[in-house]
Regions:
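Short, solvent-exposed secondary-structure boundary/capping segments
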Residues: 42, 74, 102-106
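Extreme N-terminal starter segment of soluble prokaryotic enzymes
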Residues: 1-2
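Short Gly/Pro-enriched turn/cap motifs at secondary-structure boundaries
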Residues: 7, 19-20, 52-58, 108-113, ...
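Glycine-rich beta-strand-centered segment in the early N-terminal region that forms part
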Residues: 22-35, 48-93, 133-136
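NAD(P)H dinucleotide-binding glycine-rich loop of Rossmann-like/cofactor-binding domains
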Residues: 89-145
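Cytochrome P450 core scaffold surrounding the K-helix E-X-X-R motif
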Residues: 39-46
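Extracellular beta-rich ligand/substrate-recognition surface
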Residues: 5-12
């Protein structure tokens, strides 16, 4: 699949990488429909010390569920979903108290090596994926962007 990486400060490029796979029972594989460029992406983009090939973070996306892990009960293949920027595991003390942005398992990562790609693996999907009614074709381009 294609994925964006930084090639140098102020420049990104496409590389071919392996399509992500289900690794845990509560994983979901999403086919990315839209993603955006966030301020934190721009920090790396503008960094003069960025290493060529460094993964482009990208952490906001909407997509279609392609595959689900055996523990997934909240979505099914074909569902249109939001993959939120920050999400928790749903199991730790912080998540159970309603503070999933400070999840005990979410230390220095968004559980993704970048969503500016054709597919992504989304962890803890039962807790955090947000199902959207309908399919992308039900929405105008302006609504999707």
């Amino acid at each position: 699949m294609k994925k964006t990486v930084y090639t140098k400060a102020g420049q990104v490029g496409l590389v071919e990488v392996e399509r992500p796979q289900i690794e845990a029972p509560d994983d979901v594989i999403l086919r990315i429909v839209r993603t955006c460029v966030c301020g934190s992406d721009l920090w790396s983009y503008r960094n003069p010390d960025i290493e060529a090939g460094h993964q482009n973070s990208g952490h906001e996306a909407i997509g279609i569920v392609e595959e689900i892990g055996e523990a997934i009960t909240t979505v099914k293949p074909g569902d249109f979903v939001i993959a939120p920027f920050t999400h928790g595991c749903g199991e730790c003390d912080a998540c159970r108290a309603g503070y999933d942005g400070t999840c005990d398992r979410h230390i220095g990562t968004n559980w993704s090596d970048g969503v500016q790609a054709e597919y992504m693996r989304f962890e803890y999907a039962n807790w955090a994926l947000v199902k959207i009614p309908g399919q992308p074709s039900d929405y105008t381009e302006a609504m999707l962007k």
